[in-house]
Amino acid sequence: MEHMKSAVKIFRVLLEQGEISKREQAFLYSAYLETEVQEALNLFEEEFECRLLNFSDTVYLVPGMNSHMLSMQPGEFRSYFGSNATNKDVYLSFYILMYILFEFYSGKNKDPKKTDFIQVSHLINRLDERFERLAKLEKEELDKAEEEHGINLATCIEIWMNLLVDHETKRKTKIRMIEAVVDILEDQKLAYMVENQIRTTKKLDILMRQYYLNADRVKLISEAFERGEL
């Protein structure tokens, strides 16, 4: 019974904070290492479609690739883009988020992380290039890419190409769209912005290197970006 109580407490803290570190929560971290507690936590992993990963003396709660219980839902994403935001804004934010991860973690060397930061101006230029190229595709080609990768490219192209880079009075611009995406990442303790530079956290570096880059869907998306299909 005590092992189950410990498991419940650990899972509650992970739901609230996303991680438990040996340095800051030594008692909980020590309890997590007990075999009986981990067996109890396995039940939570199955029920909530998530994974508990222990790297560098820190336990992370990670939603499963197909989880609808712990991962963010479209409505939560929309809240970052203002009261008039629609699902179209969500589709574009997904694309930008995936491309940011590609820019950071598509290295071919032993360490897949290829840069410490991304300038917002650089990101805008790269997205401009990609959407301009995608806009020139025949409808059949675009439809095929959308079906293959599960991404609403036509909507992403339409919204991005009609945005100004920045504007004093407009709430929706390319810069503000990117800032909102970074806000999402920052709230998940994955990335942050400093002087128009996007930087990743230790948490994101660990999860990408040790977990997400090995996932089939992430590999397929990364390869599609590499080939210019997205």
What are these regions (language model features)?
Residues 120-130, 208-213:
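Eukaryote-specific, cytoplasm-facing alpha-helical/coiled-coil scaffolding segments in long proteins
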